[in-house]
Amino acid sequence: MKITDVKTMVVENEAPYIGGKYFLFLQIETDEGIVGLGEKVTGSSFNASSWKDFKSQIELIHETCRAFVIGENPFDIEKIWQNAYGSRHDYRHPSLHYTSVLSAIEVGLWDIVGKAANQPIYNLLGGQVHDKLRAYAYMPRGYQESPERAGEIALQLLEEGNSACKLDPFPPLHPGPRDISLEEIGAAARIFEGIRNAVGDKMEVGIGTHGQLTTYSAIRVANALEEFRPFWFEEPVSPENVDEMARVAAHTSIPIATGERLVTKYEFAEVIEKGAASIIQLDVGQCGGILESKKIAAIAETHYAMIAPHMYCGPVIASAAIQLDTCSPNFLIQEANQGPLHKTIFKEPLVFENGYIIPPTGPGLGIELDMDVVNAHLVE
C-alpha cells in the first residue's frame, strides 16, 4: 500500500467554539482506496479573524507530506515520523506548531492501518484495557459568585453523572508568573469549602491555574487548599522550568499535573524523572501523535504516574485520545470538552454518558465524518 495524496479541509466550528473557531482536518489517501483521517490542532484559533490566518499551517502540512509522506507505506509510521521529526531546520527539537503537524499526520496513518486491519487502533497497541473511560467536566461559569453557588454547580455536575471536575480559581489568565494575594487564596479556599460541603467526597475537584503562578505563590495556594483534598494541582507554575515545578511538588501532598504544552517523550521524561508531576496531561494532537503518546504513557507507568490526557481540540483528535486511553493501563481520567459540532460531525457520535466515554469498536479511529455536516461548515 502506498500513500498517494493528502488533502486538507478547514471547517468552521459552532459557538461557543469549544476546541477553537476552526477545525483543520487531513485526509490521507492511498492507492488501495483507504483514507485516513487526521486533525491539526489549531490552538487559539478562537482569536482568528478568518480561516486565512491558518494558511501557514496548511502549507506546512502539505510541505511535510510532500517531503516525507506521499509515496510511503502508511504502515511505516515510526519511519515516517522519525524522518519528519529529524529533518527540518529545528532538527529534533521541534516547536508545538510543528509537532501538531506531525501528530495530525501520524493519527491519519494509524486510521489507515486500523482500517486495513479491520481493527480499532487500541487493538493494535496492546488491546483494550478499559471498557469505559472516566471523564471529567470543566466547571461552568458562575462558581466564583459565592461558595454556595460553587457548591450548587458542583452538585448539579454530580447529579448529571460526573465524578470529577476542574476549575481555575484565579482567572483571568496572566501573561507571566504572578503573586497570588492572601485575599485571593482565601476566596479560593472558600470556593473549595463550598464545593466540599455540597458534594462531600463523592466528586474529585482539580485545580487548573494555567501555569500563571510564581513558585512561592503556588506553594502557598497548595498549602491553603490541601485540606479540601483536590484531585490535582495543574500547571502550578509554567512548564518551562521543570525544577521549579518539582519544588512545588515537594512541598505539597496534592498531586501535580502537567503536560498540555509539552511535546515528545523527551520533554515528558524530564518532568516525570524529576518528580515534577505524577499526573501526565499529554495532548495526543500536539505531543507527537498516538504512538508518541503511548511511549510517554509507558515512561509514566515506570514511575507509577497516571495519564489524564488534555482534550481541547476538534473531534478527530478527541477520537485519537480515546484510542490511547483505552489501551493504556495507567489511564486515570479524560478531559471531556465537546461543543455542538463535536456531537453532529460524525455519522455515529462519540458516546459520552454518565461521566464516562464508551470507546468505539469500529476500525481505525472508529469514526466517519458526516460529509453533509462537514460541507455545511466547510470554508476551504
Language model feature labels by segment:
Residues 96, 106-143:
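Glycine-rich, aromatic-flanked loop segments that form ligand/cofactor-binding clefts
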Residues 3, 33, 65, 105, ...:
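Conserved, mostly hydrophobic/aromatic
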Residues 1-37, 41-48, 339-343:
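Structured beta-strand/loop patches that form or line metal/cofactor-binding pockets in enzymes
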Residues 29, 63, 93, 223, ...:
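Shared catalytic-loop signature of beta/alpha-barrel
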Residues 132, 136, 140-251:
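Metal-dependent enolase-superfamily TIM-barrel catalytic cores that perform enediolate-based chemistry
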